[in-house]
Amino acid sequence: MFYLYIPFHGIESRLPDGFDCREDAMQAAQSKRVYGYCVCDGQGNFVWSPAGSAVASHILYHAKDVADYMREHGYKYGDADQNPALDKHSENPEKIVSCDRFCGWVLYEAGYTEHQPPRKGLPLYFSPNLEEFLVASGFARIDDAAKVRPGDLIFEGDSHHMPPALPEPYRGYPRHVFINAGPAEDGLFYRYDAGSDQRIQSVQPMIERLSKPEQGRYFRFAFRAPERD
């Protein structure tokens, strides 16, 4: 028998209805790919991921979970003073998040807890903190937009659309980041994104173009999580 489950969450995470045929299980997982579901056997061993890897599906599962949590708990867009991944457990969380802090939060829930700062989180705007964290965590940089996969962190925008008065050292940093959840239809992509109040309050994943050059949000690069046991 084959089942749908969330990788790294054990056999307890599998859905109750099983499939005699592996291909039927794969088709069912494909229909739930943006939520992180994979195929396992009757013993809970990983068989297949529609996202390309168990790690990618694991990230998508937590992206959906965090996106739902933000919406249901009234989070607002802003420059968080505390790392929301840690602050959510405090007595009075500030409930402020942004595109970069959201990605850091998702990665924290997915097990990337080392080097996560308790204050400010992992900022992106005019800062290398998020990129440095990804490199330190073993993520691989992808420079070709045609090679992005589900679960990748997509970075957009650059110095051509920065404020003219911005000091030169800050002009090369990307301006936005989100988690790619894979292709949809008509050249669009699913994404998990906390770049505005409207996004935070929406049911995710959203469906948009991968980049928006007319808004200065064109693909810069992506980062992909390393494989793990």
Per-region residue spans from a language model:
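Short aromatic-glycine-(Arg/Gly/Cys) micro-motifs in beta-strand/loop hairpins
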Residues: 1-15, 31-37, 42, 46
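Surface-exposed loop/edge segments in extracytoplasmic proteins
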Residues: 11-17, 46-48, 187-190, 199-202
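Extracytoplasmic/periplasmic, Sec-exported soluble proteins
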Residues: 17, 58, 91-99, 143-146, ...
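Active-site signature of cysteine proteases
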Residues: 24, 185-229
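N-terminal capping segments
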Residues: 53-117
